[in-house]
Amino acid sequence: MTKTKIIFMGTPQFAATVLKGLIDSNKYEILAVVTQPDRKVGRKQELRMTPVKELALTVNLPVLQPEKLSGSVEMTQIMTLLESGEVGIVTAAFGQFLPGKLLVVARFAVNTHASLLPKYRGGAPIHYAIMNGEKEAGVTIMEMIRKMDAGDMIAQNSTPILEEDNVGTMFEKLAFVGRDLLLETLPKYLEGQLKAQAQNEDEVTFSPNISPEEEKIDWNKSAREIFNKVRGMNPFPVAHTLWNGERFKIYESKVADEIVNNSDNPLQAGQIVEKTKKSLKVATGNGILELLTVQPAGKPKMDIVSFLNGLGQKMQVGDKLGD
């Protein structure tokens, strides 16, 4: 059997799961793997490889790591590979725009995008799906064009978003959904058995990369909205507020009460309204939010009981979180 020649482009664990599927299928000859450069992470600023690079090195695949594709040495290498014959491009959460000339030369170019397009085009589709309270998310296999995530759709599959899900759990679920969908549909697409369908431009929504401002909790929002924001940013980039003028990260929470604050119940948004040895509750613009896992400035992440037994002893009912 002649293997389909491809160049794979991807960066996080989501992409590594897709790449592993392509490798294990034994249907593809992967000429090169393109991923983001190694980055310094954590307090110690240790240089870390991307999950895609780690996987590629274990199976001796050539790895290219351009800071930016356009005008790079790696771009020239990729063009040489594409011009050598019938070579396609497969991407999954790569994190860079592909120059148009790559799309022209490639035999085909398909992307594994973690949303139910045309909803949530952009770099943070899973985050926004959860933050917006969606009940399901999914993956779309799509043709790549010069416009971001706007190509025709080859296939799509969905999975529920549960109350206990966060960005981390959904990334993991959708990685396997994407892997299986790509492996199932790519051969059929290349054989002409599947015809790509245009996206409905009237239904397009966007999910741009999360800005630092977006990470801040607005306590005037409802408890339900803040709950969705917290899980829509866990484990990264993590929603935060201020306590005593310092950053206070919130990883997990739950809606304790969705009552409407009114004149008979004049709670101030961001105010601590209940504190016991095991729980901490905060008023919002509409309802009460219970904090479950937090990280005070300069401290490790901890469950709320550990916080209340330590630094949290200084926190009192009536204190206010936020600006």
From Swiss-Prot:
Q: Name one GO molecular function term.
A: methionyl-tRNA formyltransferase activity
Catalysed reactions, semicolon-separated: L-methionyl-tRNA(fMet) + (6R)-10-formyltetrahydrofolate = N-formyl-L-methionyl-tRNA(fMet) + (6S)-5,6,7,8-tetrahydrofolate + H(+)
Per UniProt, the keywords (alphabetical) are: Protein biosynthesis, Transferase
The stretch of residues making up the signal peptide is none
- Family matches, as CDD domains: FMT_core_Met-tRNA-FMT_N, Met_tRNA_FMT_C
Task: Quote the Gene3D superfamilies the UniProt record gives.
Answer: Formyl transferase, C-terminal domain, Formyl transferase, N-terminal domain
Q: Which residues bind (6S)-5,6,7,8-tetrahydrofolate?
A: 115-118
One GO cellular-component annotation of the UniProt record comes to: cytosol
* InterPro entries according to UniProt: Fmt, Formyl_trans_C, Formyl_trans_C_sf, Formyl_transf_N, Formyl_transf_N_sf, Formyl_transferase-like_C_sf, Met-tRNA-FMT_C, Met-tRNA-FMT_N
Q: Please state what class of enzyme this protein is.
A: transferase
Give a short account of what the protein does: Attaches a formyl group to the free amino group of methionyl-tRNA(fMet). The formyl group appears to play a dual role in the initiator identity of N-formylmethionyl-tRNA by promoting its recognition by IF2 and preventing the misappropriation of this tRNA by the elongation apparatus.
NCBIfam families xrefs: fmt
- Which family does the record assign? Belongs to the Fmt family.
Q: Which PANTHER family match?
A: METHIONYL-TRNA FORMYLTRANSFERASE, METHIONYL-TRNA FORMYLTRANSFERASE, MITOCHONDRIAL
Protein name per Swiss-Prot or TrEMBL: Methionyl-tRNA formyltransferase
Identify the species of origin.
Lactococcus lactis subsp. cremoris (strain MG1363)
GN (gene name):
fmt
